[in-house]
């Protein structure tokens, strides 16, 4: 079983160019994190502990003890935290465009992240209003119009209040300490042109995870599975099969 976890501006449809490929060989599942896509909103704060239990219930629903967990950006954060809580449920980890925790990003990137996403929404804008600018800051090659349009659509569909709560929780949640504990095969993938979580950050993560490999995907930014799906699929299937 393979489970795909989207990022902070995404939903399960972000994996539409990947699921059919992996479904040929694996039970393949993509979810909407609580407060995203078709999942319901919730009362109170966004709490990762609740999300980890949600993910465990996905395995239980399909009657699986273990799964290959693939997470992009915040999805990588969830995957890492899930490993800490449920290590025996993880066959392999794939961490895509992943970080140490948003608060550990470059200070200018953190400021840009908050200014472009949180502040406009608090000042009355809707996700669709910020979608074009945010998408252009994440995409590696603006000539890749299909990827850009998919990303704009994804951001436009965000649940505003849930998104704001998720930003707050992600900003204050650290998970770097977990990397040294990971004891399953781990693939790290990152876009060559990713400015939010650059290759240098993924190389640092690789140093901390034993039995890990890294692949830098050319001509891609922060959404490698959307920007370069064929390259992404080929490298991930090679990892999962070997």
Could you tell me what each predicted segment is?
Residues 1-44:
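Conserved HGGG/HGGXW glycine-rich cap/lid loop of the alpha/beta-hydrolase fold
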Residues 50-67:
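Conserved acidic catalytic loop of the alpha/beta-hydrolase fold
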Residues 71, 75, 79:
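Gly/Ala-rich beta-loop-alpha elbow adjacent to hydrolase catalytic centers
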Residues 80-85, 91-123:
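Flexible "cap/lid" loop of the alpha/beta hydrolase fold
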Residues 105-111, 124-180:
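Conserved alpha/beta-hydrolase catalytic His-Asp/Glu region
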Residues 182, 188-190, 194:
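Short beta-strand/loop motif that positions the catalytic acidic residue
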Residues 199, 203-223:
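Catalytic histidine neighborhood in serine/cysteine hydrolases
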Residues 220-229, 233:
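Catalytic histidine-centered segment of alpha/beta-hydrolase-like enzymes
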């Amino acid at each position: 079983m393979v489970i795909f976890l989207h990022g902070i501006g995404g939903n399960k449809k972000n994996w539409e160019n990947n699921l059919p490929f992996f479904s040929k060989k694996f039970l393949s599942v993509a979810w909407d994190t609580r407060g995203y896509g078709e999942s319901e909103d919730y009362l109170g704060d966004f709490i990762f502990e609740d999300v980890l239990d949600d993910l465990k219930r996905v395995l239980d629903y399909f009657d699986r003890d273990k799964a290959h967990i693939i997470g992009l950006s915040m999805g990588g954060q969830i995957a890492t935290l899930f490993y800490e809580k449920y290590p025996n449920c993880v066959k392999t980890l794939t961490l895509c465009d992943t970080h140490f925790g948003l608060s550990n990003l470059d200070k200018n990137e953190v400021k840009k992240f908050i200014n472009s996403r949180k502040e406009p929404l608090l000042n009355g804008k809707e996700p669709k209003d910020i979608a074009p600018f945010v998408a252009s800051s994440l995409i590696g090659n603006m000539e890749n119009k299909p990827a850009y349009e998919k990303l704009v659509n994804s951001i436009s569909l965000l649940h505003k209040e849930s998104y704001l709560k998720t930003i707050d929780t992600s900003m204050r949640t650290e998970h770097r300490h977990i990397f040294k504990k990971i004891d399953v095969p781990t693939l790290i993938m990152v876009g060559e042109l990713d400015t939010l979580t650059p290759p240098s950050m993924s190389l640092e993560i690789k140093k901390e995870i034993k039995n890990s490999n890294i692949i830098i995907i050319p001509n891609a930014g922060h959404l490698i599975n959307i920007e370069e799906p064929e390259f992404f699929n080929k490298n991930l299937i090679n990892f999962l099969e070997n």
